[in-house]
């Protein structure tokens, strides 16, 4: 199984590269999709405004691959970009694959950004949910997704508000947490992604 991590030109991709290799993927880092990969990964580095411009400019290529059944994994910001729009750095368009908006965590009594370990609450079970319910994973973010279609939410996390931890529709999966920084639970989730692609 081949995975390509899309390099937006910001941040360190070594952790997600290593995490994917550990669960069995052949991994490459590239600025463009190759067309023969089983999984395209949008990593969780950068800002919505900068990354959305990079990815939306290549949306047509990604759309062709998505319609052909290539899997997509978005991590943190990489998941947020899959929604219609986000407010970080001004109002910017996302890829629009998931309906809804990305906005700041809106709660007066929690510290922003949300950095550290928090619990995943699975609300919809499929192969991607196996072994992660009630487990702690690592977060580092100030913005969250507010989906208009709640059926895409597989699991949530509570931090002042309940927000999506994992979303999935068709061949698209996104996580607000960083599986590559979430120790054994993160590895289990990436293993789930590997098996999900093979089914």
From Swiss-Prot:
Domain of life: Archaea
Keywords, alphabetical: Amino-acid biosynthesis, Cytoplasm, Glutamine amidotransferase, Histidine biosynthesis, Hydrolase, Lyase
Annotated localization: Cytoplasm
Gene Ontology molecular functions: glutaminase activity; imidazoleglycerol-phosphate synthase activity; lyase activity
Coiled-coil stretches noted in the UniProt entry, renumbered to this chain: none
Domain named Glutamine amidotransferase type-1: residues: 2-199
UniProt catalytic activity: 5-[(5-phospho-1-deoxy-D-ribulos-1-ylimino)methylamino]-1-(5-phospho-beta-D-ribosyl)imidazole-4-carboxamide + L-glutamine = D-erythro-1-(imidazol-4-yl)glycerol 3-phosphate + 5-amino-1-(5-phospho-beta-D-ribosyl)imidazole-4-carboxamide + L-glutamate + H(+); L-glutamine + H2O = L-glutamate + NH4(+)
Xref: PROSITE patterns: GATASE_TYPE_1
Active site: 76, 178, 180
Alphabetical list of PANTHER family matching this protein: IMIDAZOLE GLYCEROL PHOSPHATE SYNTHASE SUBUNIT HISH
NCBIfam families for this protein: IMP_synth_hisH
The protein's name in its UniProt record: Imidazole glycerol phosphate synthase subunit HisH
Gene that specifies this protein: hisH
């Amino acid at each position: 199984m081949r995975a390509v991590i899309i390099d937006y030109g910001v941040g360190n991709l070594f952790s997600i590269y290593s995490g994917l290799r550990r669960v069995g993927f052949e991994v490459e880092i590239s600025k463009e999709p190759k067309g023969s990969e089983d999984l395209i990964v949008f990593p969780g580095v950068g800002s919505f405004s900068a990354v959305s411009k990079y990815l939306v400019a290549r949306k047509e290529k990604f759309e062709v691959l998505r319609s052909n059944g290539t899997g997509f994994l978005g991590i943190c910001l990489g998941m947020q970009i899959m929604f219609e729009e986000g407010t970080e750095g001004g109002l910017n368009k996302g890829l629009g694959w998931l309906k809804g908006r990305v906005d700041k965590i809106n709660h007066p009594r929690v510290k922003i950004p949300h950095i550290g370990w928090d619990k995943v609450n699975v609300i919809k079970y499929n192969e991607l949910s196996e072994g992660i319910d009630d487990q702690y994973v690592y977060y580092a973010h100030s913005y969250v997704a507010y989906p208009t279609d709640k059926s895409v939410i597989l699991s949530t996390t509570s931090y002042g508000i309940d927000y999506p931890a994992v979303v999935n529709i068709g061949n698209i999966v996104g996580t607000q947490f960083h599986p590559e920084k979430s120790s054994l639970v993160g590895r289990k989730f990436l293993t789930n992604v590997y098996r999900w692609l093979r089914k």
